[in-house]
Design a protein with these regions (language model features):
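Short amphipathic alpha-helix that is part of the acyltransferase structural core
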Residues: 1, 16, 93, 106-107
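Short loop segments at secondary-structure junctions
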Residues: 18-19, 45-46, 60, 100-103
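Hydrophobic alpha-helical segments of small multi-pass membrane proteins
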Residues: 42, 55, 74-77
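Intrinsically disordered, low-complexity, positively biased terminal segments
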Residues: 43, 57-66, 107
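Conserved acetyl-CoA pyrophosphate-binding loop and the N-cap/start of the following alpha-helix
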Residues: 46-55
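Conserved active-site alpha-helix within GNAT-family acetyltransferase domains
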Residues: 65-72, 76-101
Length: 107
């Protein structure tokens, strides 16, 4: 239910090969000032073939996402991929805060 709600309230991008989904990403945005890029995923056996690059280019060039002041994302291992598209480390991380409810999905 939580996954479906997150998809329903996001701009979602899928990558398909022979009718099988091999990639996904979603953007949470107000379409005016800010966007959060999240849940970028390519199935393991398709990685290393430029699919993630194509997906990021597609998202960054999507007409409704042009002119935003700020994009943000969290990534554990793809910093170099995003740097190719102009992403940088947060200039002043001391200004950023988060509220992380680690138990929100527990029942």
């Amino acid at each position: 239910e939580k996954v479906q709600t997150s998809i329903d309230n996001s701009l979602c991008f899928g990558v398909y090969q022979e009718k099988k989904q091999i990639g996904f990403a979603r953007v949470i945005t107000d379409f005016s000032t800010i966007a959060y890029l999240g849940d970028v995923y390519i199935v393991e056996e398709k990685r290393g073939h430029g699919i993630s690059k194509w997906l990021i280019e597609t998202i960054m060039n999507y007409p409704e996402l042009q002119g935003l002041r700020r994009w943000i994302l969290l990534t554990g291992d793809a910093h170099e991929l995003y740097r190719k598209y102009g992403w940088t480390d947060i200039a002043d991380p001391a200004k950023w805060m988060e509220l992380h409810n680690k138990n929100v999905y527990s029942t």
